[in-house]
């Protein structure tokens, strides 16, 4: 099982999930504000969510918990 690193930047309201340490060689916007990062093997290694506060209700953000296995 891989470790997932989660980073939130409040200045730009962006959440980034890093799934793998391999180098990002390509990025693809799925829809407005959602970007996938791929490595050389075309595997998803990162997910960026822009405008997080607009996408997630305020009450849900307060309850956001990260489970560590």
For each predicted feature, which ranges?
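Short, compositionally biased leader-like segments
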Residues: 1-12
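Amphipathic, hydrophobic secondary-structure cores in small proteins
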Residues: 14-48
């Amino acid at each position: 099982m891989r470790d997932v690193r989660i980073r939130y930047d409040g200045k730009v309201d962006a959440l980034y999930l890093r799934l793998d340490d391999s180098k990002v060689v390509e990025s693809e916007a799925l829809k407005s504000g959602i970007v996938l990062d791929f490595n050389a093997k075309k595997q998803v290694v990162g997910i960026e969510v822009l405008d997080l506060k607009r996408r997630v209700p305020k009450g849900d953000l307060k309850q956001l918990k990260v489970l560590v296995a």
